[in-house]
Amino acid sequence: MEKETSKKYEAAVAAFIKENKPKGTVVYDDLANQLATPYTLDAEAMEKLIQKVEDAGISVVDENGDPSEHSLKKDEKEAEKAQAEDLSAPTGVKINDPVRMYLKEIGRVQLLTAAEEVELALKIEEGDQEAKQRLAEANLRLVVSIAKRYVGRGMQFLDLIQEGNMGLMKAVEKFDYRKGFKFSTYATWWIRQAITRAIADQARTIRIPVHMVETINKLIRIQRQLLQDLGREPTPEEIGAEMDLPTEKVREILKIAQEPVSLETPIGEEDDSHLGDFIEDQDATSPAEHAAYELLKEQLEDVLDTLTDREENVLRLRFGLDDGRTRTLEEVGKVFGVTRERIRQIEAKALRKLRHPSRSKQLKDFLE
């Protein structure tokens, strides 16, 4: 591909991804018609294009919304490997007796042959509910194997299994044996979709779109790999070079990836303190300021007591000394049943008295 054509192609791919990200899926034929055919991509280039689209969090599906033939071919090996895995709990995950019993129980169920899957699929087409149940039960271990890979992303192991089982039931409903793939290959796609979407919806306090969750996970994988290779934390520039992303975009993703921390998080060996206890309240007054304020209130009360009751009350209302709400001359006049001019005179007289050295010296220290 010539340099000029290559630039146009990259721009077209970026625009295609931007347009389809909100949907989260794209039909394989649309991908081929809009990008593969105009730029005459060979099989290898098409493979790279699909990988780039899927890395952006967009699933490539057929016209019915099912996994495309390309996706199914990719999942064949993964499905075989997952079926062969043991049903032990993931490393570092504690499981209780009911979960242990569940894993033991599904481990007893025999795997189906390709011929048995076709036989059950034909019965399911006729509405046989028992066939649905048998096909699902024979693949429950597949759900557990796939769920293990998503442990540590914000959801409990049992919740991951539950979401995966929902995806499995969807696969049972939509399985088409005529495509020539084993059911486990078909189910792997649906199980993975169900789990990743559940993680995006439920694992975080602030919801992040599925495509961004997958981008974050990819960034974290690359970050860890670079940490091992370099022996230090990689810079956003180094991560961006590895992911083929601008540095500013990497910084934005890292910011989005930050997890909220609860103020109730226990601190200390005995968990007798919480994180919130150590967060400074920027609006709170210091003990010294609070003590000075209380002393000022006391001194002000003493000074106001030297005025007549009417003078004291006029000043309290005019300056909001009791409730923090100042009043106009007219409002105070209504309270006392006099004109605003009379209130102005009373206020002026009271303030003159307060300015007298015998009274003002008690408050001057608080102005320094």
Curated annotation (Swiss-Prot):
Alphabetical UniProt keywords: Cytoplasm, DNA-binding, Sigma factor, Transcription, Transcription regulation
Region (Sigma-70 factor domain-3): 214-290
Chain spans, region Sigma-70 factor domain-4: 303-356
DNA-binding region: 329-348
The protein, known as: RNA polymerase sigma factor SigA
Classification lineage: Bacteria, Bacillati, Bacillota, Bacilli, Lactobacillales
Major localization listed first in the record, in broad terms: cytoplasm
UniProt organism field: Enterococcus faecalis (strain ATCC 700802 / V583)
Pfam entry (one): Sigma70_r1_1
Regions of compositional bias (Basic and acidic residues) in chain numbering: 67-84
